[in-house]
Amino acid sequence: MKVIFLQDVKGKGKKGEIKEVPLGYAQNFLIKKNLAKEATKQAIGELKGKQKSEEKHAAELLAEAKRVKEQLEKEENRLQFTEKVGPDGRTFGSITAKKIAEGLQKQFGIKIDKRHIELEHPIRAIGLIEVPVKLHKEVNAQIKLNIKNSAE
């Protein structure tokens, strides 16, 4: 019996796959537990339509990520921060991923989730710093930060 998997089933198939499985296994386990449904012409048509819309959505997300990358990497889009600096040259406060995301939103109107900013530890130095950002699984960008001493 041909079935369309609605969820991943270990050792049998992944979500969206169409496979031939034994009739008893399909009826008594897969279909009963809503892990798969019978592969009728209508169900196959629905699956193909759903896959096309998912591909289109993924392409739109990729295009949006590339557009944001271009915006972030423009030379004039340098994020400015001013912090108090101690005698050792380190800032009293630190620049976190949350602060960077808020700064991008406030200064340039670019909305990025703070979890996409790949900051190993908060920045406590002054000067020009580049921070990597993962916008999409295929698109990475660099945010340029200019951290100044507030006493200057």
From Swiss-Prot:
GO terms for biological process, alphabetical: translation
InterPro entries assigned: Ribosomal_bL9 (IPR000244), Ribosomal_bL9/RNase_H1_N (IPR009027), Ribosomal_bL9_bac/chp (IPR020594), Ribosomal_bL9_C (IPR020069), Ribosomal_bL9_C_sf (IPR036791), Ribosomal_bL9_N (IPR020070), Ribosomal_bL9_N_sf (IPR036935)
Domain of life: Bacteria
Gene3D superfamilies, sorted: Ribosomal protein L9, C-terminal domain (3.10.430.100), Ribosomal protein L9, N-terminal domain (3.40.5.10)
Keyword terms: Ribonucleoprotein, Ribosomal protein, RNA-binding, rRNA-binding
A GO molecular-function annotation: structural constituent of ribosome
Disulphide bridges, residue numbers: none
Pfam families referenced in this protein's UniProt entry, alphabetically: Ribosomal_L9_C, Ribosomal_L9_N
PROSITE patterns: RIBOSOMAL_L9 (PS00651)
Family that this chain belongs to: Belongs to the bacterial ribosomal protein bL9 family.
Annotated NCBIfam families: L9
Function field: Binds to the 23S rRNA.
The name this protein goes by in its record: Large ribosomal subunit protein bL9
Gene that encodes it: rplI
